């Protein structure tokens, strides 16, 4: 289970473990909380009062300090799992829906034609379609794209990089994705 760590201004910074969240709470770095309580940690006993220390962790925390991520400079890292999630596990050529192990990263302009490995040049393809297209462009292979590639926003990237998002975390993130996002479909 992960905690969504935000800057004090509400920009996503990272997915952190419960233990990392406890460190932020103990260091008084949590400025605000959102979402529900997901864990409760008990510590030692105060020698004077006899009270046990308790830290309750919420699913979303806003922390003090300067944001580590500038949303305007961000270029999300490209991984197959994020690519397949962006494209909803749908082949860009035949439109079939596949399991992740049956999909490939397909370069629209192939490396053989000086194509680059970036979000705007890759789509999800099933193995047969990727093999059929080979080192050709979609036009040369007479295989038109069924959808256009795009670079995920900061908010979409945080959704794409975590498979076990709690409902309140998803609600928070999805409220900020662009209206044109495929993740809303």
Where are these regions (language model features)?
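Short metal-coordination and nucleic-acid-contact micro-motifs, chiefly zinc-binding Cys/His arrays
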Residues: 84-89, 118-122
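Histidine-centered nuclease catalytic patch
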Residues: 76, 96-124, 133-149
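Short, hydrophobic/aromatic-rich beta-strand segments within well-structured domains
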Residues: 3-4, 91-93
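A residue-level signal for conserved active-site and pocket-lining positions in enzyme catalytic cores
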Residues: 10, 83, 141
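A generic structural motif
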Residues: 9, 116, 129-130
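Short, cysteine/histidine-rich loop/knuckle motifs that typically chelate Zn2+
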Residues: 93-94, 128
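Short helix-coil boundary/hinge micro-motifs
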Residues: 1-75, 80, 146-185
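Internal, conserved structured core segments that host functional sites
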Residues: 81, 87, 95-100
